[in-house]
Amino acid sequence: MASPGPNLPTVKRALILLAALAISASAADWPEFMGPTRDQVSAETGLADTLPAGGPPLVWEKAVGKGYSAPSVRDGKLVVHHRMAREEIVEACDAKTGLTLWKYAYPSDYRDPFGYNNGPRCTPLLTADHCYTLGAEGVLLCLDLVTGKKVWQRDTAKDFDVPEAFFGAGSSPILEGGLLIVQVGAQLNSGVVAFDAATGKTVWENVGEKTWNGVPMTGWPGSRIVEWNRNDPRFEKQASYCTPVAATIHGQRHILVCTRQGLVSLDPKTGAANFSFWFRSRQDATVTAMTPVVHGDLILLSNCYYKTGSVLLRVKAGGKSVEEVWRGLQLEVHWTRPVLEKGMLYAFTGRNEPDARFRCVEFATGDVKWDRDEGWPNGGHAKLEAGEKAPDVFGRGAAILADGKLIVLGEAGLLGLFRPNPERIEELGRWQVPQMRYPCWAAPVLADRRLYLRDEHWVVCYDLGR
């Protein structure tokens, strides 16, 4: 149910100055997963060129519940989806102060089968009027962005017979032409579903047995083909942790979804399939979590498990098939999608904390331009005891791009600034964010020169302006 604030966060003195300032002309929203253009890039300027020893000015900090989803910001509102006790909570705050505007809570019994936290994984999607969220158990919500009142709700797990996913629902919804596109992961042919964004009614559903049965298992040894097993939902789980991508290729609009089995292109209006491409690890208990990188007619897929590596695909004229451009182990990305800048990918590669590396890779060729070890020392796991100092590495960091700089958050809360440079690593500064602790798996969010960071306990706001 929706409820008003006040739930006051700790507000620092910097807030007093901030409140007196009008929103600058360079103000920009970050209304959904991967930002305003869905590519981790912001058009904002006037950002700091380095990080001072004491860090940028703290604007506010706010205690929140469990979850891995990033907050979203639109029209002065920040929305964070988190879990406290046995409730998932969608909470809207004033982006400048952190003060709660409204909350909507609903029951959740989700327990992660692998021992990770039980909070939501998907980032809220904000429009001018509405807030869309997808919870860990597959509850799809549309709320009024002003009041927090429920507009409609769907229980995707029940409505579409979804097998239990490895880590809960983790593919953020996107909006395309009035349709909310969701990777539901259902049997038999409801891996991807389009909902009417205004009403929540199902418009189309596709992807499953008819997509994959009989197709070549590209990248696997021998000449194997897919034999879809209706009786083994464990093997035929469809949901991955990649968010759908909407792109125009050769003049045709595509919804590109990397499911657990591989890449599928769908017509956004009808859900009809254009092409599919098998891409997954040979081990059962694995998923693909990196959202594809799309540029022109090229699509990059990557997976960190068991030498699956990466493949760059080119969509052929007509939009009905693809061909491989390169394939290799240059990138084995877990979930932190690379940033593409001037033909170069800036990426954190590696499955676990000890084998994390920061790399610059040429998008078109796969050539590695530079590489730096960012793994946790001594092969240790990243979970730290209370008071223990975090290692001075980024691990599997998450990056965004703004004002000609990469803003990186490491998975134990190390904040870094880098200048994109294919010739060498050009680090502008680093600082350990005091509130952030492992696991910091939500990417940074930038709106109106304010940087929003989230871990399992806090959302913090820092002034990143010059």
Report each predicted region and the residues it spans.
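Hydrophobic h-region of N-terminal signal peptides that target proteins for export
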Residues: 18-27
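Noncatalytic, solvent-exposed loop/strand surfaces
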Residues: 27-466
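Intrinsic disorder/low-complexity segments
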Residues: 1-10
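Sec-dependent signal peptide recognition
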Residues: 10-17
